[in-house]
Amino acid sequence: MRMQQTLLGVGGLALSLMASSVMAQTLTQAEIDQLGTSLTPIGAEKAGNAAGTIPEWTGGLSPNAGQALGDNFYEDPYADQQPEFVITAQNYQQYKDNLTPGQIAMFERYPETFKMPVYKTERSVGYPQEVYDQVKATAGQAKLVNGGDGISDFSHGTFAFPIPKSGAEIIWNHNTRYRLNVHRWYMQAMPQTNGSFTLIKLEEEVGYPQQMSDVDESTMPNTLLFFKQRVNAPARLAGNVLLVHDSLDQLKEPRMAWVYNA
């Protein structure tokens, strides 16, 4: 099994799929031909925006853009960049249209200490060539099922809908994005307004059938991923384990999950 180890300070992204009335729309060859030309190889707009604040995508960072520092960390390829400007409690009103209510509240609650440096946009994402080749070869094959709650005709590839026609397809692009197997240790915290917090230390493993050399993909065509989480701290939660098998079509084969409480 190929593994990618990372150490994260915070993490977490929860997605909720809501059923909607969606219909499969077949891509034309002309649309597929846009991949790698007017669109990036995975379907994003290649050109920059009219305002000039988002640049053209030119391939992303090269594999040797940052030198390895050890312990799975790499040097910052943008270390020399300086902020274009800094948003503070004194000037946030002029940027209000681009700020969330939560960010505005932070400026108002902590006017002396909360600042938001803004850097130029960099389109640094790049994937292996085999990912681009696979996305183009399978474009138009995947189909939404069960009102968008699942997909079919998708055999453990990446970016199921590179030219999405609905919000549900965009969500499935996120769910099927290119990822390596992961073994990571990270911490979660929910700070109170007075600054106090309790750290929850977690260890997680995530495996994808197409990235697991000891798995026969043909025996599990509906499997999206395998997930295992162990709580290491605090003591009252230490030893708790969560195991999940997620599927592409959860009506055909519902999620399987097990919890062990120490």
Language model: regions and residue ranges:
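Hydrophobic helical h-region of N-terminal Sec-dependent signal peptides
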Residues: 11-17
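Well-ordered beta-sheet/strand-loop patches within structured domains
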Residues: 258-262
